[in-house]
Regions:
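Catalytic loop of short-chain dehydrogenase/reductase
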Residues: 79-80, 85, 108-178, 190-191
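Short, small/polar-rich loop/turn modules that mediate ligand/substrate recognition or access, typified
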Residues: 177, 182, 239-241
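Rossmann-fold cofactor-recognition segment
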Residues: 42-56
Length: 255
């Protein structure tokens, strides 16, 4: 069992990829605590209902989380069809806030996995902006930076997935050197989950048709969960700051 004896916190555990990671992590021996804004139907070792877009709610609710944590999977997310302010709060600012709040509870060797996306693949094109946002390290500072550097609704999902990849890389080095905590991200291509339809509305049929020609099919959530569980495990102990594509080859097809 790859995660025997580990305590893993998983956001977005009530649906899709987060739910599948929760199921597989328990199967691999972990004690799993789920977090979501929606109730869960899964068998978990604990569940905390919270809105990850509000730092005050996060601060109040994390008292219910364990004092000692071996892993965190940030799977909660919203598509770009919702308001860009909510995308910023849930997919980036709240994710960072929760992660930083839990770092002091993480044991040496702990692993954090952030779910980015193939849609964040253009991060090198806006690297300077993403580094500036990463340096605005708190929720409040990040929000202030975004107020002076507004992100368009049309590409907000892509923007904050790019920003997440860059923050993961920048912050992972400090976490590994200072606290022996590993942080990585994964970049799935399309996955059969309830938000897949939103991506079609978000990207438009033409882009979806173009990308569809590059892949055999969307992934099933368990095809994403396996690599995430690997990154949580000690087998991945020398993997730090990586952004792992799990996309059936789409990224390779862009070359
Ligand atoms: N499905 C895809 O094609 C795909 C592709 C690449 C990346 N992703 C990313 O994978 C992650 C998981 O998405 P999914 O496909 O499993 O979607 P999903 O909708 O099935 O699951 C997302 C979960 O996040 C929760 N959530 C959303 N907002 C929240 C909030 N404010 N507070 C607490 N919980 C909240 C939802 O309740 C839901 O349970 C997301 O970050 C998404 O951007 C998905």
């Amino acid at each position: 069992m790859k995660l025997h004896g580990k305590t893993i916190v998983i956001t977005g555990s009530s649906s899709g990829i987060g739910g599948e990671v929760a199921r597989l992590a328990r199967f691999e021996g972990a004690r799993v605590i789920g977090i979501d804004r929606n109730d869960t139907l899964l068998t978990l070792d604990g569940f905390v209902k919270m809105d990850l877009g509000d730092p005050a709610v996060i601060d109040a609710a994390i008292t219910a989380l364990p004092d000692r944590i071996d892993g965190l999977v940030n799977a909660a997310g919203v598509p770009g069809t919702v308001n860009s302010d909510i995308v910023a709060r849930v997919n980036y600012l709240g994710l960072r806030h929760l992660t930083e709040a839990l770092v002091p509870r993480m044991l040496k060797g702990a692993s954090i996995v952030n779910i980015a996306s193939i849609l964040g693949a253009d991060w090198p094109h806006r690297l300077d902006a993403h580094k500036e946002l990463a340096a605005a390290a708190s929720f409040v500072l990040g929000k202030a930076w975004l107020d002076t550097n507004p992100v368009q609704q049309e590409n907000c999902y892509q923007y904050f997935k790019e920003a997440l990849i860059v923050w993961t890389k920048k912050r992972s080095l400090e976490l590994f050197m200072q606290d022996n905590i590993r942080m990585n991200s994964v970049a799935p291509g399309p996955v059969f989950t309830p938000i897949l339809g939103d991506f079609v509305s978000m990207l438009g049929q033409e882009r979806v048709d173009r990308d569809s020609a590059l892949v055999k099919r969307p992934a099933l959530p368990d095809e994403i969960a396996g690599p995430i569980v690997f990154l949580l495990s000690d087998d991945a102990r020398w993997i730090v700051g990586a952004n792992l594509p799990i996309d059936g080859g789409i990224e390779a097809a862009y070359v």
